[in-house]
Curated annotation (Swiss-Prot):
It comes from the Eukaryota. GO terms for molecular function: aspartic-type endopeptidase activity. This is Aspartyl protease family protein 2. The keyword Iron-sulfur does not apply. Belongs to the peptidase A1 family. It holds the Pfam family TAXi_C. The keyword Nucleus does not apply. PROSITE patterns: ASP_PROTEASE, PEPTIDASE_A1. Aspartyl protease. Not able to cleave BAG6.
Amino acid sequence: MVGRRKALLFSLCFFFLSLPSFSSLPSFQTLFPNSHSLPCASPVSFQPDSDSESLLESEFESGSDSESSSSITLNLDHIDALSSNKTPDELFSSRLQRDSRRVKSIATLAAQIPGRNVTHAPRPGGFSSSVVSGLSQGSGEYFTRLGVGTPARYVYMVLDTGSDIVWLQCAPCRRCYSQSDPIFDPRKSKTYATIPCSSPHCRRLDSAGCNTRRKTCLYQVSYGDGSFTVGDFSTETLTFRRNRVKGVALGCGHDNEGLFVGAAGLLGLGKGKLSFPGQTGHRFNQKFSYCLVDRSASSKPSSVVFGNAAVSRIARFTPLLSNPKLDTFYYVGLLGISVGGTRVPGVTASLFKLDQIGNGGVIIDSGTSVTRLIRPAYIAMRDAFRVGAKTLKRAPDFSLFDTCFDLSNMNEVKVPTVVLHFRGADVSLPATNYLIPVDTNGKFCFAFAGTMGGLSIIGNIQQQGFRVVYDLASSRVGFAPGGCA
């Protein structure tokens, strides 16, 4: 009797183990097309408040200091908010054009021989040589408001995980583009200081630049779209609400030209030592995170957090990978992709491998909008999605998107799920992160694209709704769903 029971239990166990796993079954989720449309250029969430800013200035003049705070939270707005005169269709078209330029520049940089890219911009008079820093891929997509100097003068700054330097326009200007706030004048700040040519900060720049008369450090950042900024490399106090961060090395640009219209400059969040996280690791424990909202369906602002509060308890982490060839970017290991609950055949870790000389790989980027995958992986993923979405009415291609659907007058539709399998972290995307509106007539497109190069990029559309955690102390990146609440 006992033997029969054991045999029966063994048979049942074998039967259940032989069944396909639940994850291999087709899986769908619901998209509500009528609830998602092209976002308008909504007003920025942090309109200048002269009273509070004046209060901060008076506090600092009297010697008050609030530098002890361990975490800082700031609102973020999309760069489209600075183009209030454009229609939703025009804004989306401009976004895709910016995205194409950025991806092209990153791909060009990644394809070069090992070593930092150097692009020379016009050399202004009085400069013995130029310092080239940062990467030639243009600015990011999100900006915040912060104070510069003492007393604090408030300006808008673009945040970008693909840049390694902090810089802003400074008076006097030889050439300056239009910005929404008065240009920062370092002569009116009590805490501004130039950096000697012999200092460690100056030596960390990609090449040595020195004003031979004043013996002070110079910097230059050149971008792939032809824009550039040149000026003095200096230190200054930055103010985030009521928190001061002293001695931040930044570029004070007196000669600037480019596409950074509206924002005063850029707060680099890359992996390099001169980025804002790189310089302030002792203050914020080498941790920061951001959460980017779906602007077509949420009135909440996006946000960025520096410090221990940046780390979500529910985040799933994947290790950061090192690439000396492009040490600014955050590389991760992508092992595969599932569509409709099933791993896409042929999309394996080998397609996304970062080789020994720095080619290939996958980066997480806040400034790229649409995720680009190496072409064989994209084609396999796209074809799997088309099969899973075969009941939806197809629509003509749109811009870089080759898989589009006519969802006009539809309240809800079932779409295949999409999961990105990183090393140690499976990230299940909401439907709104991969099937997005591209016009005001109900056309939705699969928001991925292929790339002919070897580098894949996880863009900010796919990051929406997740708190993306950069824990540099532990060399890892995490994803926490629902992190914008």
